């Protein structure tokens, strides 16, 4: 087991560890606005979310317009489309922006002090704008089928109530954000650094598995930007009536995943208490 030693200056030195926990991000840092790397990351989130929505919603519309089930990708293909695109885009953008592509993921990482409030807000705006543009491209290229088959928008399916849909979104997002925390944990990253695809792969696979479970209930949101972009472009009352589910459910799921990972699995509360007790100046 590793041991923490606190020096007189209050610095924590960790022995026997082959990894270093990064320091917490500042809560709010206006200085980030002056950095090109900050805006480059926001642009990367915008483009990644645009591409994600274009490919996935186009896949959904293509599936729905096929009259022969054997000629379409099926629900399994839709799930692979979402999971596969997340795998590809996280792999491409992780080194630039962290590869969030999802306001719920950004929110969870903010709660864990991985990103500042300012960065989280800018990322969410970029993600929502990218989602709107991505779905807009689908409508421009496939206008007839797009309008006819629901625009890929999320809503509560017939036979399910809003409580069930909310629970499905909450649990689905918990699975995703929990996987993000686990895949990007410094301990695991140090151990698996020689295989760079090991972080994007489980994240994409989590998205795939959640889609298999929740497509019949809500069409699978677990990403407020995905749901918002589709709702804005499709713009039907039924979609907007259910829309709150696709923000509140994922954000509550992200909150639960962040708390579980930080305070149960990583035992952040116990470590903080131990450091407090071992420092005689406190």
Swiss-Prot record:
Q: Where are the transmembrane segments?
A: 39-61, 74-96, 116-138, 159-181, 201-223, 243-265
Q: What is this protein called?
A: Aquaporin PIP-type
- Motif NPA 2: where? 223-225
Disulphide linkage map: none
Q: Domain comment?
A: Aquaporins contain two tandem repeats each containing three membrane-spanning domains and a pore-forming loop with the signature motif Asn-Pro-Ala (NPA).
Write out the residue ranges of the motif NPA 1.
102-104
Q: How does it sit in the membrane?
A: Multi-pass membrane protein
Where in or outside the cell? Membrane
Q: Which SUPFAM superfamilies match?
A: Aquaporin-like (SSF81338)
Q: Which family does it belong to?
A: Belongs to the MIP/aquaporin (TC 1.A.8) family. PIP (TC 1.A.8.11) subfamily.
Q: Does the keyword Repeat apply?
A: yes
PROSITE patterns cross-referenced by the UniProt entry = MIP (PS00221)
Q: What role is this protein assigned?
A: Water-specific channel.
Q: What would you give as a GO molecular function for this chain, any one?
A: channel activity
């Amino acid at each position: 087991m590793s041991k923490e030693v606190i020096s007189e200056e209050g610095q924590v030195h960790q022995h026997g560890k082959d990894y270093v926990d990064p320091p917490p991000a500042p809560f709010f840092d206006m200085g980030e606005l002056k950095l090109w790397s900050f805006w480059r990351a926001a642009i990367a989130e915008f483009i990644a979310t645009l591409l994600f929505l274009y490919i996935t919603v186009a896949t959904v519309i293509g599936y729905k317009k096929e009259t022969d089930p054997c000629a379409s990708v099926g629900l399994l293909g839709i799930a692979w489309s979402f999971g596969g695109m997340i795998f590809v885009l996280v792999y491409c953008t992780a080194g630039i922006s962290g590869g969030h592509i999802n306001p719920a993921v950004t929110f969870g990482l903010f709660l864990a002090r991985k990103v500042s409030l300012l960065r989280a807000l800018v990322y969410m705006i970029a993600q929502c704008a990218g989602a709107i543009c991505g779905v807009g491209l689908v409508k421009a290229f496939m206008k007839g089928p797009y309008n006819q088959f629901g625009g890929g928008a999320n809503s509560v399916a017939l036979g399910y109530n809003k409580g069930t849909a909310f629970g499905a979104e909450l649990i689905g997002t918990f699975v995703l954000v929990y996987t993000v925390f686990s895949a990007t944990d410094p301990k695991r990253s140090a151990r698996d650094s020689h295989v760079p695809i090991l972080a994007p792969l489980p994240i994409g696979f989590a998205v795939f598995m959640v889609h298999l479970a929740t497509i019949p209930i809500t069409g699978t949101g677990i990403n407020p930007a995905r749901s918002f972009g589709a709702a804005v472009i499709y713009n039907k009352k039924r979609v907007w009536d259910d829309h709150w589910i696709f923000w509140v459910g994922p954000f509550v799921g992200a909150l639960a995943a962040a708390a579980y990972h930080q305070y149960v699995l990583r035992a952040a509360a116990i470590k903080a208490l131990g450091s407090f007790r071992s420092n005689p100046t406190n």
